[in-house]
Amino acid sequence: MSDDHGHAHDDPGTDDHHHHDRDHLGVAVLTVSSSRSLDEDPAGDQIADALESAGHGITTRDLVPDDYDKVQATVERFVDRDDTDAVVTTGGTGVTPDDVTVEAVEPLLAKELPGFGELFRRRSYEEIGTMVVATRATAGVADG
C-alpha cells in the first residue's frame, strides 16, 4: 500500500512540504478583556512567557475590551505587521454575549485549522473536565 495521496510533496523529487516551517516566529499577543489591563494580565503573561521560552519573539502585545470591531481591527493590524508571523489571542472565547473573539477573528481567516480547537478542548478537558464544553477556540491562516 502506497503512502502517496496525490499531493506534490508525495513525489520523492519534491522538497519537504514543511520547508516553510521556522524555528523562530515573531508573535503578536492580544488579550481580549473588559476587566483586565496589560499590567494585570496573567493569561497574556503566561502566553508570552511560553512563546519566549520556546524561542519565539513577542513583536507586540495589546489588550482590547470585549468589542467585535476593536478585536477585529487589532488582529488585522497585527496580521499586517511585517515582523509578525502569528497572532495569539486570549479571552473572549466563552459563551456570554460579550465573548466575541471567535466571531471577530474567523472572517479574517483564509483557511481554518479545526484541529487546533479539537486539541485545545482535549487538553483543557484534562484541567477543567466537562466545563470544556463552554470553551471555544479557533485558528487559521490569514492572507491565504
Feature roles, as predicted:
Residues M1-G144:
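Non-catalytic beta/alpha edge segments that cap or flank active sites
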